Amino acid sequence: MNEQYSALRSNVSMLGKVLGETIKDALGEHILERVETIRKLSKSSRAGNDANRQELLTTLQNLSNDELLPVARAFSQFLNLANTAEQYHSISPKGEAASNPEVIARTLRKLKNQPELSEDTIKKAVESLSLELVLTAHPTEITRRTLIHKMVEVNACLKQLDNKDIADYEHNQLMRRLRQLIAQSWHTDEIRKLRPSPVDEAKWGFAVVENSLWQGVPNYLRELNEQLEENLGYKLPVEFVPVRFTSWMGGDRDGNPNVTADITRHVLLLSRWKATDLFLKDIQVLVSELSMVEATPELLALVGEEGAAEPYRYLMKNLRSRLMATQAWLEARLKGEELPKPEGLLTQNEELWEPLYACYQSLQACGMGIIANGDLLDTLRRVKCFGVPLVRIDIRQESTRHTEALGELTRYLGIGDYESWSEADKQAFLIRELNSKRPLLPRNWQPSAETREVLDTCQVIAEAPQGSIAAYVISMAKTPSDVLAVHLLLKEAGIGFAMPVAPLFETLDDLNNANDVMTQLLNIDWYRGLIQGKQMVMIGYSDSAKDAGVMAASWAQYQAQDALIKTCEKAGIELTLFHGRGGSIGRGGAPAHAALLSQPPGSLKGGLRVTEQGEMIRFKYGLPEITVSSLSLYTGAILEANLLPPPEPKESWRRIMDELSVISCDVYRGYVRENKDFVPYFRSATPEQELGKLPLGSRPAKRRPTGGVESLRAIPWIFAWTQNRLMLPAWLGAGTALQKVVEDGKQSELEAMCRDWPFFSTRLGMLEMVFAKADLWLAEYYDQRLVDKALWPLGKELRNLQEEDIKVVLAIANDSHLMADLPWIAESIQLRNIYTDPLNVLQAELLHRSRQAEKEGQEPDPRVEQALMVTIAGIAAGMRNTG
C-alpha cells in the first residue's frame, strides 16, 4: 500500500513540476511564484496551521482580475493531471485495480470453497450472467473531449516511464512528449463555449466505444475465459457475451425539448454508421491475416469455385463490400438523401455473425484453433456486444406527456377527456383499445406540436431496425395506466413486436407504491400475454434522494426492490431491475461491488442493468485496461450476489430502518421544504444560479423554468452543494435519525446491523465518504463571503449538524477516523484537497465579485466569469464526482 502511495505521489509531483514549467513559459515567473505560494499555504493550512489558512484567504482575496484566471486554471489543470495519475495507478502493476481482473479469480475461489455450491451451479450462474450498462450524457461530464484525449496520452507516457529497462534517450523522449501534452492542455480552453447538442453528446458516447470499449470488451472476455478455465476447467462459448451497452444520448427526451424524433432518427443512423466504420477496420485486419488455404467442405461449399483459392479472404472481402455499401447508404441518409436500400445492406447482427463464424468453425476443424482464437474471436465477440447498431438506445419520456397526448385525442374524438378520467376508466379505455383491431388515430387529425412529437417518437421506434432500441422508459410513472398508455401509442404507430416498457419510480411515494402498480398490471390478462414472462422496472435514485433525503430514499429503494422481486417470483415473471444511479452519493453512487451486494436478495437474478453517468463513464471506462477492471468488478459482484445472496434482514432491523426513514425524512424536509430561510440560503451559499450559465449538457437545469428547489433537477441540486463542500443532500437527516435511535438505547443493534447487513454498512460507508470530502471551514467561508448575515445562523446550524453526524457514524461503525477501512480513497482525497481548497476559496471570491457587480448594475467582467467557470470544473475534478 505504501509503495502505491509513494509511486502515486512521485508521479503527481513530477506532473505538477512540468505544469509549473509550462505556466512559467506561458506567463512568466511572477504567476508561477504566485501559484507556488498559494499551494504551499494550502498545504500548511491543511496541516492545521491557522495563520497560514488566514494568509491563504487574504492572498486569494487580493488577486487582481488579471491574475484570477491563470491561478484558477493552474489548480484546475493540476487536479486533472492528479486524476490522470490516479487513474494510471489504479491499473499499474503496483496499483489497486491491477488486481481487479483478479476479482474474478478471487470470487471463483470463494464460490468453490462453499460446500453447498457445486461447480455445475457456478457454471450455470456464469452462463446466466447479464450486464447491461446504459451510458447517459449527464451534463456533469465537464471535461472537454479534446482534453480527455490528451489525458489518455499522458497515461500512456506514465506507463512507459514505469518500465525499468527504459534507455536514457527513450526516457528523455517521453518526458519531452509529456511536456508537449501538458503545454497543449494549458493552451486549450477547458470550458466549452457552447452547450453540446444531443448529437454532440451521442458522438461523445461513440468516442468512448471507439477509444476504450471496442478493445476493452474482448480483453475482458479473454480475462474471464482464462479465469474460468483455470478455476473451473470451463471454456466460454464463442457466442457468449454477457455485456451489452445501451445509451440515453439522443433517446432521453425527459425534460429536454432538444431531443426530438428527428434527433433520435439521426442518432440511430449515426450509431449504425459508426458501427460499420469500426467493423470495416476489423475486417481489413482479417483480410490481411486470414490467408490460409485449408478449409472444411462446408466452408468451400459456401465460397464456391470463385473463392476456393483463398476461402477465408474471399468471405472477408465479401463482408467488406457489404459494409462499404451499407456505410455509403447510411452516409447519404445522414445528409438527408432518400436512397433505395442497396443490395446486401446490413441491418441484422446475424448477417455479420454468419460469415465470421463460418470461418471460425472451419479454422477450428482444420487444426488452426490458435488462429481462430486471435483477432477473429475478438471480432465475433464485438458482433455480439455491439453489433450493427453499435449501442442500442433507450427512449425516455415523462408520463404526463403521454396522458396529455391521449387527452387531446379523446377530446378530438368527442368521447370525453382522458386526462380527467379516473384510473379505472383510463385502464378500461386503454385495454379496450389495445384489444381492438381498428386503428384509434383518425387520418385527418392535426394534433398540437407537443402531441405530434410524442406520436413521431413512437413512429421512429416502429421504423427502426428491431434490436436498435432497447426499452421505453417512463419517468415519473405513478399508475398502471402510465404503462398501458405507452403500449397503446406504440401499437398505433404500427410496432410489430413487444417493446420492453419500463416504468421509472422515482419519488418516495412512487417507490412506496411501485409494488401495487406492478401487481395491478400483472393481474391484467392482456398485459401478461404481451410481456411473455419478462418485466423491466427502473428504480430512481436521484429524485427520491432529493425528495426525501438520502436515508429515507435508500430504504424506500430497498423495500420497493424487495417487494417487486417477491411479487414477480410468485407470478413466474423474470424481473430486470434497472438502476438509475448517479456518480455522486446523493444520486445513489457507491463503489459498484458494495452497492450490488447491499441490494435485496434476488435483485440480480434477471441480470444487472444500470446507468453509467457522464463523468463516471470516463473514470470507469476511459481506457481499455480500466474497462477490463470495471467489467470484472461487476462480474464478480453479480456472481457473488446471485450465489451467496445477502441475508434477509431481521424484522427488528426493518423496524429500525422504518424509524430511521421517518425521522430522517422529517428532518430533511423540515429544512429543505419548510424552513423559509432555506431556499434563499441555498441560492446565495452555493453557485446554483451561476451553474445555469455553464454550457453543460443539452438539457435545461430545471424541469420547469420557474419554481423552487423542487423543480430543480437532481443533478444541479447536488452539483451546487458539492461545490461549496457542505455536500448537504448526501447526509442531511441521516445522522440526526441515527442519533435519535442511539438515544433510544439501540446502539448495539445498530452496530450489529453495521456488521452483519451489507445494506446498512454500505449506507454508513457512503456517509463516511461524503464526510471525508466535505469541509466545514470552507462551507463557513462561503457563508461569510456570500450570504446575508441574517441567514448565517442557518449555515451554522447545518454545519453543527454535520459535526454531530460524523461523531454518531464513527461510533456506530466503531472507527476512530473517517474512511479507516479504505485508506487508499482517504489518501487520494487528502492528496487532492491541497489543490481543491484554493479553488473553493477562489470560487467564493469570484461569486462575491460577480454578484457585487450585478448589484451595482455593472456588466459582468469576462475575466471573472471565465475564472468562475474554471473553478466549477476544477472543484468537480477535485471531488471526482459532480452531480
From Swiss-Prot:
- Any single Gene Ontology cellular-component annotation: cytosol
Record bears the keyword Lyase: yes
Explain what the record says happens when changing residue 587 to S: Loss of activity
Please state what class of enzyme this protein is.
lyase
Q: Which Pfam families match?
A: PEPcase (PF00311)
The UniProt note on how this protein's activity is regulated states:
The enzyme has distinct binding sites for each of the allosteric effectors such as acetyl-CoA, fructose 1,6-bisphosphate, guanosine 3'-diphosphate 5'-diphosphate, long chain fatty acids, and L-aspartate.
In the Enzyme Commission scheme, what number(s) does this protein have?
A: 4.1.1.31
Keywords of the record, alphabetical order, are: Allosteric enzyme, Carbon dioxide fixation, Lyase, Magnesium
The entry describes its oligomerization and partners as: Homotetramer.
Fetch the PANTHER family from UniProt.
PHOSPHOENOLPYRUVATE CARBOXYLASE
Name-wise, this protein is Phosphoenolpyruvate carboxylase
